[in-house]
Amino acid sequence: MAEPVRKPPPAPSDYDAESIKVLKGLDAVRKRPGMYIGDTDDGSGLHHMVYEVVDNAIDEALAGYAKEVLVRLNPDGSCTVRDDGRGIPTDIHKGEGVSAAEVIMTQLHAGGKFDQNSYKVSGGLHGVGVSVVNALSSWLKLTIWRDGQEHFMEFHDGDAVAPLAVVGAARDKRGTEVTFLPSTKTFTMTEFDFATLEHRLRELAFLNSGVTIVLSDMRHAVEKREELRYEGGVEEFVKYLDRNKTALIPQPIIMKAERDNMVVECALWWNDGYHETVLCFTNNIPQRDGGTHLAGFRGALTRQVTGYAESSGVARKEKVALTGDDCREGLTAVLSVKVPDPKFSSQTKEKLVSSEVRPVVEGVINDMLKSWLEEHPSEAKIVVGKVIQAAAAREAARKAREMTRKSALGITSLPGKLADCQEKDPAKSELFIVEGDSAGGSAKQGRNREFQAVLPLRGKILNVERARMDKMLSSEQIGTLITALGTGIGTDEFAIDKLRYHKIIIMTDADVDGAHIRTLLLTFFYRQMRELIDRGYLYIAQPPLYKIARGKSEQYLKDERALEDYLIDTGLEETTLRLSSGEVLAGNDLRKLVEDSRQIRNLLRGLHSRYNRQVVEQAAIMSVLNREIFGDPQKAVAAVPYIAKRLDALSEETERGWQGRFAEGDGFLFERMVRGVKEVAALDQALLGSADARRLDEFAPELQKVFPRPTPPAMLKRKDEEISIHGPVSLFEAVTAAGRKGVALQRYKGLGEMNPSQLWETTLDTNARTMLQVSVKEIDEANTIFDELMGDKVEPRRLFIEEHALAASVDV
């Protein structure tokens, strides 16, 4: 088991105001936030805000002072990060004349990371510190437990509301807590994604063995919580990555050493698959593009494995020449280096360029892997056997390619199925990979021949997750696809500059078979031509799901949301809503109410199944879906009979009799007897404190105006028809039902159901179509998904289906 890297320095007191070095202020951050925190539109910059604060806590752990980090997503949209480290220094900074805590929060590049005495190595994705988080937050609250006292400070838009103040005794607490709300002035999206945060925090937990990281999501009625703690470090990380694969040797190979003031940790494990997964980190920061540490690792690995194969006589016996690619087939590895002053190719630190790191990594891997191979001959023989099999398959694939070149369907001639375009510039050319000959025929007739090519593929293509290169090249569909693209395949052959199209568009049916074929194609491109994805060349077509016909007019709708929009538009024609007060809503006022009702319907749909949505809806109208209700029990008790009365008005006469009560600390409980069976509906503290309840509560003033009492109800009038409306959900359903009258709705399952002109109008026309661009955010997560869905093991696939079955929406 790998030992933690942390060694507490002897004098914790050295970390004080004197350690804080100031470089410059924060104005530039607000003007160009993307330079400091990443993209402010796609969510990456938003999550980097959390990582910046977490990195400070992890730095405390690396220095040996913190053991637990808590990250909590709050119902109001804010995020709290807390650690049990030393606490940010609170004494006065001599150079600035204010507390060191205020300096750290308001000055760019201020912190202990610039003082080697405070932190030997430190993380931080952009190296800009928590001050940027403060600058880009609507508000930030800082609590510090240090030297027996609790200190508090608040900031609005990056500026201190008041100086740091002592608000009480720390008792047995120590550490720092930062709670911040991202500013809507900077970020177009301010909702944190649990899975994104979990992925990064899990990495940090693996890389810092012994540190506990707790991620908690309090935004919903049921708390979601993950406790991440891994004593095994990089060894356990590799086991986690390979959890769905069959290992070739019993345990991963662990290598760890400290040289030239750098720490190198590496774990590697071979499995029976055909793909390489190597994750690289410098000071806990991931390098997606590798760098000098990866180059050192690969050089040493190739040298030692091929050297052992030669010296043991196995390679000579099999008469094969081994390459680095052969050595890395089926390899999963995690390489982590701790470097005092690393240099990267860009601000986002995607590639390490510190030249001094390569010889250190190469030396450690050379020495320790050589020893392991000599000390474990039986396991080494298995590894070398796998490498030789890879070399033999590579040689067979090379011969298959040679045969292909000499055949009639060689590289020089394009497949007969391909309907090519006239344009020869790849940047202006598109290739549609279409499922089946019928859809292929429509696409060929409907396309713009000038720049759009069509390649129909019949049947399901080979699952490349379970196939070596030689088997892959024997597949007719794969061969046709490779030839059409023009790039070749394999490490030695693949040439991105020979790609004939810079838009490769997967176009399959909207049924189960179409989804399967799309997944098989994505597997092929991800495993064999990932550079196409990295360069943004791969897309998925989004043909419409619906065709609407009303009278002589026809319209195509791409998804359920577009269908709802259409039904609302038609349902509101000649429609009014008369409230119990006598006021009549129509036009834009009624449209806004229906749009709000749709939001409420969606929020109610998202609630846990244990909650009665009708009861929650009526409670929302009465404005009791908030935690403040616990502070005003009198109001809560008074609301109970009104909610019960409203529920009776919604029920059939034989199913009435709702009764309720409110208990402080618990919430509301409503019940009724239906055919001798008691039905119970609870609105507990978890629901009342959730973000969903908070959002529903925001609609209360509007809902109380529209639905002030259960009787008489509001009346929706359309032409000669009147419908009773008791709440927002019934309003939305009545309007969309009205919109369906006189409308012929056709749902497309297959592309072959469209004629060429329809396919052009909806899916091929560059001015009208919608496409999804394929990208990979987290390589290890993508590997896991392909392992689970396309790999040999059935159990992970079964568990995946069980977990996600209810969320699936596919046509059989």
Can you say where each PLM-predicted feature lies in the sequence?
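Conserved phosphate-chemistry cores used by DNA topoisomerases
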Residues: 1-812
